[in-house]
A protein has these predicted regions:
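Hydrophobic transmembrane alpha-helical segments in integral membrane proteins
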Residues: 1-20, 149-153
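Hydrophobic alpha-helical transmembrane segments of multi-pass membrane proteins
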Residues: 14-25, 42-62, 82, 112-120, ...
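Membrane-interface helix-boundary motifs at transmembrane edges
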Residues: 30-41, 92-103, 172-185, 217
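Helix-loop junctions on the outward
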Residues: 53-74, 209-214
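Membrane-helix interface motif
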Residues: 119-132
Length: 281
């Protein structure tokens, strides 16, 4: 029981950290220099809301088991949508050229997982769901819940990989822009993505799924919260400082220069635009 209380206290720390970051980002929206930055801020706010919901669920998982069974659809839904919105942020920041809307098909699989968990919540008796989560018994319900959670984990790993590939592609496309190499590198974003998967998602998954290795290491759950808090702080500070460079879409005049072959003047104007965006931020 004492271990459950300790685990709940530790799991509450990322929720509090996310709430503080959420407030800071919300207060900063009016200062955002352009529409793209505001869009990034709104996406970050969504991520922090989902993080709060998810870690609140883990607190319930530790000390309020009956409440967690009822809360399970919210916990699963938030966990499945977090990597999608993090990828959306990467998608917006790394946009080069004509800006396209974030494809809605990325939300289909998380939505399907959410529907699946809600169907279980409304059709399967409470005690049967309780046994599937806490008794580690073999049943159709436990198999569906475990499979859904595994898909959420794979989804997180997949979109982390897609984010890293997009950052790599972005770096390759902006090598000719010399306005601010440090801000264009997005090393902080790559670090958050890798750090989150290796030191947060996988250990938490091991605990929830009851993998023996993680259950033997009784205090490992203490360290899973440290990467969560650290990545939240790094993400918040870099967004607040606008530690990235938004490459503006090519204008009609620039397209005309490209057609006429005036590449030198075009390149100079593009660099000046990026420099101006940097100074204005």
């Amino acid at each position: 029981m004492n271990q459950d209380i300790g685990r709940a206290i530790v799991f509450s720390i990322p929720a509090v950290s996310a709430a503080v970051s959420l407030i800071m980002i919300s207060l900063d929206i009016t200062r955002s220099s352009n529409t793209v930055n505001r869009k990034i801020h709104y996406s970050i706010i969504t991520v922090y809301c989902l993080i709060i919901l998810y870690w609140s669920g883990l607190v319930m998982y530790s000390i309020a088991r009956d409440a967690f069974i009822a809360y399970l659809p919210v916990c699963f839904s938030s966990f499945s949508f977090i990597p999608i919105f993090l990828y959306m942020i990467t998608y917006i920041i790394t946009g080069v050229g004509d800006r396209k809307h974030f494809p809605t098909y990325h939300f289909i699989l998380p939505a399907c997982l959410t529907v699946t968990i809600h169907v279980i919540a409304f059709t399967v008796p409470f005690q049967q769901r309780w046994n599937a989560i806490y008794d580690n018994g073999v049943s159709l319900t436990s198999a569906i819940i475990d499979s859904t959670y595994i898909i959420c984990i794979l989804l997180s790993i997949l979109y982390s990989g897609l984010s890293l590939l997009r950052i790599k592609s972005y770096k390759r496309q902006v090598t000719n822009y010399s306005a601010d190499i440090y801000r264009m590198s997005l090393d902080w974003l790559s670090f958050i993505i890798i750090f989150r998967v290796l030191l947060q998602t996988l250990p938490i998954a091991g605990l929830i799924l009851g993998i023996e290795l993680f259950n033997k290491l009784g205090v490992i759950w203490t360290f899973t919260t440290l990467p969560a808090v650290f990545t939240q702080i790094v993400l918040c500070l870099n967004i607040l400082s606008e530690n990235y460079v938004i490459i503006e879409p090519i204008t009609a005049k620039e397209k005309e220069m490209t057609t006429s072959g005036n590449y030198a003047q075009l390149e100079r104007q593009r660099v000046e635009t990026v420099s101006y965006t940097h100074l204005r931020a």
